[in-house]
A protein has these predicted regions:
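Membrane-integral, polyisoprenol-dependent glycosyltransferases
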Residues: 1-254
Length: 255
């Protein structure tokens, strides 16, 4: 929450950042997960802080080495596998690509970041393999690869894709109720134009969106879509998108 406040306060003002932090701290899902001793909240914190650090690195033109970001990525990798490292890199890479950075430069830069963030986890995995042997290796394969492919040897939190929508809506109580009530008091405009026109306006809107809002939107969309792919779905898997949803909710409430 403090990292999110600092990130948005520098770029969007203290009022919006404070409200964003308050919403993040007080929604049902974050509060519930934060009071339980589980790895999911730690994973979310490390992934979100890695996203903030990689964004700052992008602001600097990918110059230098984002050591703090690499440490966060390494910690996320150790917490719950390579997905903790891959998703922040994916979000930031897509953001920079949309903003016109050359694909080759993005690829090489994030390849280096990815390899650097694998050093500490590799040391731990080697040590764990020396103790656990083939049984440990099979567990890693099942949890990190077969879970995504839906080929685990046992059923684990299998739910349909719409389950994620339900958990986010429920998890953001009481703010989802506030948003739903506010819909009755908004002024609506008549919908007009063809579907192609809507698509063109949407593309223009995305291109003209300021950097912070676009980065926050991509963090929500890409992480959410990724966690809709595997059969295994839990509400805590989506915790990394909650600070970014809080940013848009804060904008909406101030509006």
């Amino acid at each position: 929450v403090l990292a999110g406040y600092g990130f948005y306060a520098r770029r969007r003002g203290t009022e919006l950042a404070f409200l964003m932090g308050l919403i993040t701290l007080t929604n049902f899902e974050v509060h519930r997960a934060g009071t339980n001793c589980r790895v999911d909240m730690l994973l979310a914190a490390l992934m979100v802080m890695a996203l903030y650090q990689l964004y700052r690195w992008g602001e600097k033109g990918l110059k230098g080495v984002p050591w703090l970001g690499i440490l966060c990525l390494s910690g996320a990798f150790l917490t719950k596998g390579p997905v903790g490292m891959a998703l922040p890199c994916l979000v930031t890479a897509v953001f920079l690509w949309i903003r016109g950075v050359h694909f080759g430069r993005i690829f090489l830069s994030f390849l280096g970041i990815g390899l650097a963030s694998c050093v500490l986890p590799l040391v731990w995995y080697v040590a764990a393999y020396q103790q656990g042997g083939e049984e440990f290796l099979q567990l890693v394969l099942e949890e990190n690869v077969l879970r995504l492919l839906g080929k685990m040897s046992y059923s684990s939190h299998e739910n349909p894709a719409y389950y994620n929508v339900i958990t986010v809506v429920a998890g953001y109580a009481p703010y989802t109720l506030l948003v739903l009530l506010s819909l009755f008091f908004l002024k609506y405009h008549k919908v007009s134009g063809k579907l192609s026109g809507w698509w063109n306006r949407f593309r223009t809107y995305i291109r003209e969106m300021d950097d912070v809002r676009l980065f926050s939107l991509l963090s929500i969309v890409l992480i959410f879509v990724f966690y809709c792919i595997p059969k295994s779905k839990r509400s805590v898997y989506l915790l990394p998108i909650y600070p970014f949803l809080a940013y848009f909710l804060a904008e909406y409430l101030l509006y």
